[in-house]
């Protein structure tokens, strides 16, 4: 059985910087784990449930938003065609030509832009860049930044325009 994250967010707690920081740190960890799991899926082709189970056994999830990890991992897989269709016009390469880790980061970020409207687009971009700095090639973060900067206005037009005012 998959354990559920017991650190549920309460909107009344949003005023507390410690709680907000704790939630964002757990989400960052979830994004890192999901990126690694998506990379593993791409490279090894194992089943999602098998990869998820392995990650939960092999890693300490005490500082990870486990629910968000699962949502990202399965959400990217379920919506991969829609994600790749959204990504393609913003790329100078084909999906197949992309570095596998940068592809995992871009798919994860695109999923958040498409399906997690509650996460501000600037947060999605910044998190994608940070993931690329940790896991990507030397200039991978610049590539990820460029793609997400093109993608965000296409997927979050109203939000991006409102921010630029």
From Swiss-Prot:
| Entry keywords, A to Z | RNA-binding, Transcription, Transcription antitermination, Transcription regulation
Entry keyword annotation includes Transcription regulation: yes
- One Pfam family hit: NusB
> What terms describe the molecular function in GO for this protein?
RNA binding
One GO cellular component from the entry?
Answer: cytosol
GO BP of this protein = DNA-templated transcription termination; transcription antitermination
Q: Where is the composition biased (Basic and acidic residues)?
A: 10-21
Region described as Disordered: spans on this chain: 1-27
SUPFAM superfamilies, per the entry: NusB-like
* Stated family: Belongs to the NusB family.
- NCBIfam families reported in the protein's UniProt record: nusB
Function, as annotated, reads:
Involved in transcription antitermination. Required for transcription of ribosomal RNA (rRNA) genes. Binds specifically to the boxA antiterminator sequence of the ribosomal RNA (rrn) operons.
What this protein is called in its record is Transcription antitermination protein NusB
- List the gene name: nusB
